Amino acid sequence: MDARILQDNDDTSLPVNQASVTRIHKKPGKPEAEAAVRTLLLWAGEDPDREGLLETPKRVAKAYQELFGGYSESPEEVLGTTFEEVAGYDDMVLVKDISFFSHCEHHMVPIIGKAHVAYLPEGRVVGLSKIARVVDIFARRLQTQESITAQIADSIQRILKPRGVAVMIEAEHMCMAMRSIRKQGSSTITTTFTGDFKEKADQQVRFMTLIRT
C-alpha cells in the first residue's frame, strides 16, 4: 500500500506510512512531536531548559520532516514520465554510486551508503535523475537494507516494466558502529535481481563488472 500523508492543520507535521499503521485516530502534530523530543532529553539526563537545548525540540521535529520525507513521495510519480524515442536503444542503463542516507527501523540511527541501479529497457527509458530520486524516496524512510534494496527494484520493475532490474546497495550501519559491538568501517552488501538479470548469469556478471570499473 502506498504511503500517504494524513492531513491535519499543521503543515510541518510528519507524514505517516499507512501501510504500517493499522489503527490511528489522530496523527500527532508538531507540538506533540516537540514534546516527545523534550521527554527524550529528560530521559537521557539532560536539562531541556538550558540555553543550548531550548530550540532543540523544534529543530529535531523540523529535521525529521526532511529526514523522513520519503513517506510523502511516490515512485509512481517520479517514474511516470518516460521517453520512447531512444533510437532503438535496448541495452543496459546503469546509474552507479548513488549516495544516500537512511535510518535503521530498529534503532532510528543512520545508514550511510551508495546504490547501484541498472535496468534493461523494454521500449521506454526514464531520465537518469529519476533513478536517483527513487533511491532517495525509499531511503528517507525507516528501513532495513534488505527492504530498501527490494523496494527500489520492485518499483522500477512494476512501473517501467523493463526486461530486468539489478540493484546493489553497499552501506555502513551506525547501529553497528555507534552501539553494541561498535565495529566502525564494516559494510553490508545486498542485491536484488529481476527478469533477465535474475535468469541470465551473463547479465549479472556484466552488471557486477560495470559497477566495479
Curated annotation (Swiss-Prot):
<keyword id="KW-0342">GTP-binding</keyword>
<protein>
    <recommendedName>
        <fullName>GTP cyclohydrolase 1</fullName>
        <ecNumber>3.5.4.16</ecNumber>
    </recommendedName>
</protein>
<comment type="similarity">
    <text>Belongs to the GTP cyclohydrolase I family.</text>
</comment>
<dbReference type="GO" id="GO:0006729">
    <property type="term" value="P:tetrahydrobiopterin biosynthetic process"/>
</dbReference>
<keyword id="KW-0554">One-carbon metabolism</keyword>
<feature type="binding site">
    <location>
        <position position="104"/>
    </location>
    <ligand>
        <name>Zn(2+)</name>
    </ligand>
</feature>
<comment type="subunit">
    <text>Homomer.</text>
</comment>
<dbReference type="InterPro" id="IPR018234">
    <property type="entry name" value="GTP_CycHdrlase_I_CS"/>
</dbReference>
<dbReference type="InterPro" id="IPR020602">
    <property type="entry name" value="GTP_CycHdrlase_I_dom"/>
</dbReference>
<dbReference type="GO" id="GO:0046654">
    <property type="term" value="P:tetrahydrofolate biosynthetic process"/>
</dbReference>
<keyword id="KW-0479">Metal-binding</keyword>
<dbReference type="GO" id="GO:0006730">
    <property type="term" value="P:one-carbon metabolic process"/>
</dbReference>
<dbReference type="InterPro" id="IPR001474">
    <property type="entry name" value="GTP_CycHdrlase_I"/>
</dbReference>
<dbReference type="GO" id="GO:0005525">
    <property type="term" value="F:GTP binding"/>
</dbReference>
<dbReference type="InterPro" id="IPR043133">
    <property type="entry name" value="GTP-CH-I_C/QueF"/>
</dbReference>
<dbReference type="GO" id="GO:0008270">
    <property type="term" value="F:zinc ion binding"/>
</dbReference>
<dbReference type="InterPro" id="IPR043134">
    <property type="entry name" value="GTP-CH-I_N"/>
</dbReference>
<feature type="binding site">
    <location>
        <position position="175"/>
    </location>
    <ligand>
        <name>Zn(2+)</name>
    </ligand>
</feature>
<dbReference type="Pfam" id="PF01227">
    <property type="entry name" value="GTP_cyclohydroI"/>
</dbReference>
<feature type="binding site">
    <location>
        <position position="107"/>
    </location>
    <ligand>
        <name>Zn(2+)</name>
    </ligand>
</feature>
<keyword id="KW-0547">Nucleotide-binding</keyword>
<comment type="pathway">
    <text>Cofactor biosynthesis; 7,8-dihydroneopterin triphosphate biosynthesis; 7,8-dihydroneopterin triphosphate from GTP: step 1/1.</text>
</comment>
<keyword id="KW-0378">Hydrolase</keyword>
<keyword id="KW-0862">Zinc</keyword>
<dbReference type="GO" id="GO:0005737">
    <property type="term" value="C:cytoplasm"/>
</dbReference>
<dbReference type="GO" id="GO:0003934">
    <property type="term" value="F:GTP cyclohydrolase I activity"/>
</dbReference>
